[in-house]
From Swiss-Prot:
One annotated GO molecular function: metalloendopeptidase activity
Entry EC no(s): 3.4.24.40
CDD domains listed in its UniProt record: ZnMc_serralysin_like
Cofactors demanded by this protein: Zn(2+); Ca(2+)
Disulfide bonding pattern of the chain: none
Extent of the Hemolysin-type calcium-binding repeats: 345-362, 363-380
Family to which the UniProt record says this protein belongs: Belongs to the peptidase M10B family.
Protein name per the record: Serralysin
GO biological process: collagen catabolic process; extracellular matrix organization; proteolysis
Compartments where located: Secreted
Major subcellular site: secreted
Length: 486
């Protein structure tokens, strides 16, 4: 087909276009808009979304006195676990107690989770006088406090984080991954780093804060930030009673705006989920009953979301700032802004895999999957089951960056171009012809008997060129009936 290439043409797919496609293509469109307020019909939008949601967490510009504006250098903070009552213990709490070893280990994991995303060097010290951040328990609170911490100020060299020892969340499995106690450690440490609640509410308010009455913008939920008081269900997600152990989407953006990013962590090929090499419990799935809740921060390499051990129907989206439904939860996995995850592996359910602009490798696994590579030269596997490979525009597989479909089974799998954008001149839709004549929407199917590769191409008009569409399908000859054209 090289002879068809010549002139360049511009065309792109429009989400707002008035189109009707197949059931699978429309399901893909639905998931491309998932968790976007105003586009996802499952979300009741009580507050307007904010373009500055992450900045709201640092709206007070709280900073340490020894902090400068050079974010290229790691900022050092020392911390300690108090062993005795300090002289300046807050007036409204009493009956001090120290952290035990398990509690210390959990708090250190929360500290580590902040160091993973920000250019901060945390150093443990046993000298309480030189510590910037202290950890301690209390048994009695005149104000009924569960936990609290202080925000940094230029005149302060030490801040305390305090936790109610009588709360069961700090004495049982709740300080393990996904527990409320573990999230509390992460939340209070966030305060000592300068992060506020998303709006001006607090547990000490006379009237208990609620999302409806206290949130000032849409993203004030535990799907976007560990600094929120409000359930992720308010923004469309559902974590089934678990809590994030590490900073989430807006936390990461906010903390990096203050301290700079950790640009050295996970710079190699990283696997999240099953077969994880992250050495982080919140990024790791051990069996089909594992529950994942995280925002991925990654700085390089060829990286993979491996959710192969789950049996539920999953929706895996590799685009930055997107949310995925993984392992039976809703919107529980997200990707930090500026991060590229290249690959995804689905499980044994009927999954939807959505690629990004990179060269993705997408593997659906068992089940009847929908595979969408997006831009970039992608390698696609449907796996067992009746799989559908969807294309929406020529930019998703141009001749010089062709996709490869590796395990297509004629009579079972489908290639769906029912929503393929042909521009204003392509009202006739995609249709098969024996040879290109220059008409918009003409499609040609060829088979190379030597290489055992099918070539499927669509012309956008005129002589076939580098801006048209061409995908390679490995295996036995496929038929026109294997395609969904409308």
């Amino acid at each position: 087909m090289e002879k068809y290439m010549s002139l360049k043409k511009k065309i792109s797919y429009s989400e707002d276009k008035d189109v009707s496609g197949s059931e699978k293509a429309n399901e893909l469109l639905k998931w491309l808009q998932a968790y976007i307020p105003g586009k996802d019909s499952n979300i009741v939008v009580e507050h307007e979304p904010s373009k500055d949601a992450a900045k709201e967490l640092i709206r007070g510009d709280y900073r340490w006195g020894h902090q400068d504006d050079d974010k290229s250098k790691a900022f050092q903070l020392k911390y300690t676990f108090l062993e005795s009552k300090p002289d300046d213990m807050p007036w409204h709490i009493s009956e001090f107690s120290a952290f035990n070893e398990k509690q210390k280990a959990a708090a250190k994991l929360s500290i580590q989770s902040w160091a993973d995303v920000a250019n901060i060097n945390f150093v443990e010290t046993t000298d309480a006088k030189e510590a910037n951040i202290t950890f301690g328990f209390f048994d009695v609170s005149l104000t009924g406090s569960y936990a609290f911490a202080y925000l940094p100020r230029p005149e302060k060299t030490q801040l305390g984080t305090w936790y109610n020892a009588k709360s069961r969340t700090f004495s049982n499995n709740d300080i393990d991954v996904n527990g409320y106690g573990r999230q509390t450690f992460t939340h209070e440490i966030g305060h000592t780093l300068g992060l506020q609640h998303p709006a001006d509410y607090n547990a000490s308010d006379e009237v208990s804060p609620t999302y409806k009455n206290s949130a000032t913008y849409f993203e004030d939920s535990r799907a976007y930030t560990v600094m929120s008081y409000f359930s992720e269900k308010n923004t469309g997600q559902d974590f089934k009673g678990i809590y994030s152990s590490a900073p989430l989407l807006n936390d990461i953006s906010a903390i990096q705006a203050v301290y700079g990013a950790n640009n050295t962590i996970r710079a190699d090929d990283t696997v999240y989920g099953f077969n994880s090499n992250t050495d982080r419990d919140f990024y790791t799935a051990k069996d089909e009953n594992s529950k994942l809740l995280f925002t991925a921060w990654d700085t390089g390499g060829n990286d993979t979301f491996d959710f192969s051990g789950f049996t539920q129907d999953q929706r895996i989206n590799l685009n930055e700032a997107s949310f995925s439904d993984v392992g039976g939860l809703k919107g529980n996995v997200s990707i930090a802004r500026g991060v590229t995850i290249e690959n995804a592996i689905g499980g044994s359910g009927n999954d939807v895999l959505i690629g990004n602009d990179a060269a993705n490798t997408l593997k659906g696994g068992a089940g009847d999957d929908i595979i969408y590579g997006g831009l970039g030269a992608d390698n696609l596997w449907g796996g067992e089951g009746k799989d559908t490979f969807v294309y929406l525009s020529a930019k998703e597989s141009p001749p010089l960056e062709r996709d490869w479909i590796h395990d297509f089974v004629s009579g079972e799998d489908k290639i769906d171009v029912s929503l393929f954008d042909l521009g204003e001149a392509g009202k006739g839709g995609v249709r098969f012809v024996r040879e290109f004549t220059g008409e918009v929407g003409e499609a040609v199917l060829r088979y190379n008997t030597v290489d055992k590769v099918n070539d499927f191409a669509i012309n956008l008009g005129g002589e076939f060129s580098y801006d048209d569409f061409w995908v390679k399908i490995v295996g036995e000859p496929i038929l026109e009936s294997d395609f969904i054209l409308s």
